[in-house]
Regions:
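Conserved ATP-binding N-box helix of the HATPase_c
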Residues: 35-59
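Bergerat-fold GHKL ATPase/HATPase_c domain
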Residues: 1-43
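Conserved beta-strand-loop-beta-strand hairpin that lines the nucleotide-binding pocket
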Residues: 1-7, 51-128
Length: 128
């Protein structure tokens, strides 16, 4: 079964991170990711969402977009918080950023109009 792009929009609350983690884990499993890669991606989404929620205290919603690629998954997380202070100073040297970089194949801070976000790439390897 082909995995289509998925979009999940939830209120910007930390108690909903488990829902984001479950969705990304399910889609990664359907794409044939190994258990370790699924766990890395699940933890990366949790870390990225926590990072965004901490930086955007004025956020009212958190958006997760997952798109399959020929080599894995592209994951975009964003909030509707004002972007004037995004990215936070030193964000690319923070512990959260180091964790994201270790768990994914690519992590990028994104500013796009009225949103602030993160773009993550996780390449798949056959489960086994």
């Amino acid at each position: 079964m082909a995995v289509e792009e998925a979009l999940l929009v939830v209120p910007a609350r930390s108690d909903l991170l488990s829902l984001l983690r479950a969705v990304v884990a399910d889609l990664a499993a359907r794409r044939g990711f190994s258990y370790d890669a699924i766990d890395d991606l699940r933890n990366a989404v949790s870390e990225a969402a926590t990072f965004l929620l901490g930086a955007g205290s004025a956020a009212s919603r958190l958006e997760l977009r997952i798109a399959p690629t020929p080599r894995g998954l592209d994951v975009d997380l964003s909030t509707d918080a004002p972007t004037e202070a995004w990215p936070p100073p030193g964000a690319d040297r923070s512990l959260a950023w180091q964790v994201l970089s270790a768990l994914t194949d690519e992590a990028v801070l994104v500013v796009d109009g009225a949103t602030q976000g993160l773009h993550l790439v996780k390449r798949s390897a056959p489960a086994g």
